Amino acid sequence: MTLDLTGRVAVVTGASRGIGYFIARELAAAGAHVIAVARTVGGLEELDDQIKAAGGQATLVPLDLVDMAGIDRLGGAIHERWGKLDILVANAGVLGVISPIGHVEAKTFEKVMTINVTSTWRLIRSVDPLLRLSDAGRAIILSSNAAHSARAFWAPYAASKAAVETMMRSWAHETENLPLRVNAADPGPTRTAMRAQAVPGEDPETLPHPSEIAKRIVPLASPDLKETGLIFQAKHNRFVAYRQPE
C-alpha cells in the first residue's frame, strides 16, 4: 500500500547524509513537508534540491545538536509556523571511538552522550507538545543492536543507544492512551560513513544501501501504524519487544 503523508509535517535530524538523508527524501516523496536538521549546510542544500526536483517540500534547519538552546527554539518555531508536528525522526548520532573502555578519552565519551542522548532528550522535550497536537503523531528514534549486544570496545556508543531506547519505551508508556506512537528503529549494518569508521576493513558492497533501509523505516510514520514502544529491526523488517533480563 502506498504511504500517503500529504499535509503532514516531519522533522528529521541528521538529514544531510546517510540514512537520515534518504528518510527525509522518502517522507517528502510521500507528501510530507520535511524539516531537515543537520549541521552540514552543503548536504542540506543537496537534499533540498533532490526533494524539490521530485515535487516535494522541505525547510532547512542548519543546527549543530550540541546547541541545546537551538533545539529548544526549534519546537517554538515549528509551532509558530505549522501549529503542530506529525512526525519526528531522531536520527542524528555519532560513533565516538571503537576502543577499550579504559582508553576512551573523557571528551570523546561526553560528546557521544551529548549528541546521542542529551540532544535526543532535548529534541523530544522540544517537540512532544506538538506531536500531541497531531491526530496521528509518530516518533522514530534511531537505535542500534549495539544497545543489546554490549560488544567489546563499543561501550560509549552502546551505552548511548541503550539510553535512547529506554527513553523511547518510557515515552511510549507515557503516551500510550494518545494517538502518538513512539518506536525505535534499528537499521542494522548499513553502507554509511559511520559503519566504515566502525569497521574499516569491511566491504561496503556487502551491506544494504541507506536508501534501502530508509524505505523500510519510513512506514513507521504511517498514520495507520498501531505499534508503540517497540524496536523495529530493519534488517528483518519486523517489530520486537524489549526483553527484561531473566
Located regions from the model:
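Conserved glycine-rich Rossmann-like NAD(P)H-binding loop of the short-chain dehydrogenase/reductase
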Residues: 30-46
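C-terminal helical subdomain
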Residues: 177-178, 184-185, 192, 200-243
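Active-site loop of short-chain dehydrogenase/reductase
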Residues: 8, 56-57, 84-85, 131-144, ...
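Substrate-binding pocket helix/loop in short-chain dehydrogenase/reductase
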Residues: 99-101, 105-110
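The beta1-alpha1 cofactor-binding region of Rossmann-like NAD(H)/NADP(H)-dependent oxidoreductases
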Residues: 42, 62-73, 106
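Conserved glycine-rich cofactor-binding loop
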Residues: 9, 16-17
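Catalytic loop of short-chain dehydrogenase/reductase
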Residues: 132, 138-163, 168-177, 189
